[in-house]
């Protein structure tokens, strides 16, 4: 259920932590609301959003701090996605995160795109975020430059081509927009604008995870005794 997302409990320095992470790769015959489809890891679909929502709720019940590890290209879009109510499920996940009152840490390993970045524990949509970490490969944006340029100028290119006009000036504007988007999604810019609190080397990530976990368990207002009283659970498919 929700194969694009990994949700589970881990022990860090002997302490329980909830982990949510994107899973990469092709997902055959998925999502279920599209016939003969092939899902792409890193994108969020209906089941994955439901899965994360329930996992956040369970972590909140047992007062288990959470770490979000994201490499996402966004939430699925299109008519089928609208019918599957992905927007509402994303809103529900944000609501659950906000009301969990759990200390959370977010790591953007590579891509953090659009609303998926927010619902995966991103600081822009999470008041409980203790801090966010980026890497040398981090890119955070609303969409990539090529997509933005195509959305902005495709119609104009079609009209100019029909009119027999020179396409060069419009293509130059598209390239300029792509370059601007690329520059403003680089790690240094993300840190400068506060999208992440710090850019760290990959081997150093564990130290930050340890520091967050140890700090979370020293806060009596966030942790209660039942956090060790876990019961076996499973997130079931609707079928």
Give the residues covered by each predicted segment.
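Ligand-binding clefts of soluble mixed alpha/beta catalytic domains
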Residues: 1-239
């Amino acid at each position: 259920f929700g194969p694009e997302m990994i949700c589970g409990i881990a022990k860090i320095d002997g302490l329980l932590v909830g982990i949510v992470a994107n899973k990469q790769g092709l997902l055959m015959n998925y999502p279920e609301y599209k016939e003969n489809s092939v899902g792409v890891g890193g994108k969020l679909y209906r089941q994955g959003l439901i899965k994360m929502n329930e996992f956040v709720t369970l972590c909140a019940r047992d007062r288990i701090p959470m770490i979000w590890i994201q490499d996402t290209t966004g939430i699925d879009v299109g008519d089928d996605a609208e019918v599957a109510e992905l927007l509402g499920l994303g809103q529900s996940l944000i609501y659950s995160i906000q009301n969990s009152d759990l200390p959370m840490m977010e790591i953007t390993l590579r891509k953090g795109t659009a609303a998926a970045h927010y619902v995966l524990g991103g600081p822009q949509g999470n008041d409980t975020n203790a801090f966010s970490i980026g890497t040398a490969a981090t890119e955070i944006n609303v969409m990539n430059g090529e997509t933005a340029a195509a959305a902005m100028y495709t119609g104009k290119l079609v009209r100019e081509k029909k009119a027999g006009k020179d396409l060069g000036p419009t293509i130059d504007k598209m390239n300029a927009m792509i370059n601007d988007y690329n520059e403003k999604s680089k790690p240094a810019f993300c840190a400068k604008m506060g999208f992440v609190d710090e850019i760290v080397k990959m081997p150093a990530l564990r130290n930050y995870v340890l520091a967050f976990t140890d700090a979370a368990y020293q806060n009596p207002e966030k942790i209660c005794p039942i956090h060790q009283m876990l019961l076996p659970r499973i997130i079931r498919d609707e079928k």
